[in-house]
């Protein structure tokens, strides 16, 4: 029987594998192309995972959030442009999205006033920044909903065949 790690500061890849009760050997067999030694290097942060390895782990562990984590925290481009998405319940995602959409509805006229001339003047800057931040919150809510959907599909909570049939109509 494999021993359980007692390491305190486990990274997300280590925690995810252990949450599935997989040894490194079993995870390697599941993924077919990543050796137990490579998994150990990734988990002990002696080596960063490659994007293709993260994609494979996300698929085989049924945790699409690993891709977002990698992009937001380990990819130099993603660190600058990709926000880390936190896993939330569907109701919380929808309520946050609706709150942001309602706020933007109230700001729609102001956005038109600010941008109609193609310039942002000093007296418009504060409102423009607020609107930008609200749009970013909407974007994050959309990404969170997408990640939630991917996880539900990966784990079988949402029937992938039905989902794809409806999506491809």
Spans of model-derived segments:
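DNA major-groove recognition helix of helix-turn-helix/homeodomain DNA-binding modules
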Residues: 52-70
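Acidic, glycine-anchored loop motifs typical of Ca2+
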Residues: 86-89, 106, 112-128
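Short alpha-helical DNA-recognition segment
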Residues: 19-41
């Amino acid at each position: 029987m494999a021993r359980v790690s007692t390491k305190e500061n486990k990274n997300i890849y280590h925690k995810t594998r252990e949450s599935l009760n997989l040894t490194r050997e079993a995870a390697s067999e599941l993924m077919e192309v990543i050796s137990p030694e490579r998994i150990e290097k990734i988990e002990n942060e002696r080596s960063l995972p490659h994007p293709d390895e993260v994609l494979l782990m996300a698929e085989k562990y049924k945790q699409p959030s690993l891709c977002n984590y990698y992009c937001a925290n380990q990819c130099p481009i993603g660190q600058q442009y990709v926000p880390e998405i936190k896993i939330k319940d569907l109701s919380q995602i929808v309520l946050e999205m609706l709150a942001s959409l309602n706020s933007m509805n109230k700001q729609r006229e102001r956005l038109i006033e600010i941008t109609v001339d193609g310039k942002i003047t000093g007296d418009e800057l504060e409102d423009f920044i607020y609107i930008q931040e609200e749009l970013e919150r909407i974007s994050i809510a959309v990404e969170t909903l997408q990640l939630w959907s991917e996880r539900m599909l990966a784990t079988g909570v949402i029937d992938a065949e039905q989902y794809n049939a409806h999506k491809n109509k």
